[in-house]
Amino acid sequence: MMDPIKTYEIKEEELAKTAYATIKTNKGNIALELFYKDAPQAVSNFVTLAKEGFYNGLNFHRVIAGFVAQGGCPYGTGTGGPGHRIKCEVAHNPNKHKRGSISMAHAGRDTGGSQFFLCFVDLPHLDGEHTVFGKITSAEGLSVLDKIKQGDIIESVVFSSSL
């Protein structure tokens, strides 16, 4: 049976307080700007799960050089999620899958849950299919991304209203 769709009602002013995220990994920190105006459900979901500690200690279970580093599966296999799913936000989302983008992983339209991926390179064939909800903000973050290997650990995710 498919998990139920979850809809968040977090106000934009509240999301603005979490406009920047840092994914702390065993390879270093990856600072992100989150596109809360373009993908409010994806950002609300990511922020809520992260604040609950959902991502703490999970691994990057799928890392493909020249493609993506994917994490957020509670089983570390790519088969799990948070027990709910969210709708894709692609129709009015101007953001593209560029090097350093963070996007929702899913197994088909409106099946995203907790899994996300970071793009090693531009991936235009994913535009309109997956919800881009942020981007890496610094060369340092991109350098850390390039060091991520399969099995590396997401230690925690923290948020702030500014860089």
From Swiss-Prot:
UniProt keywords (A-Z) are:
Isomerase, Rotamase
- Give an example GO biological process: protein folding
Q: Which residues span the membrane?
A: none
Assigned EC number: 5.2.1.8
Which Pfam family is an annotated match for this chain, by its short name?
Answer: Pro_isomerase
Residue ranges of every copy of the PPIase cyclophilin-type domain listed in the record: 17-163
The family database entries (PANTHER family) matched by this protein are listed as: PEPTIDYL-PROLYL CIS-TRANS ISOMERASE-RELATED, PEPTIDYLPROLYL ISOMERASE DOMAIN AND WD REPEAT-CONTAINING PROTEIN 1
Q: What does this protein do?
A: PPIases accelerate the folding of proteins. It catalyzes the cis-trans isomerization of proline imidic peptide bonds in oligopeptides.
Q: What is this protein called?
A: Peptidyl-prolyl cis-trans isomerase
Q: Which organism is it from?
A: Helicobacter pylori (strain ATCC 700392 / 26695) (Campylobacter pylori)
What gene is this protein a product of? Answer: ppiA
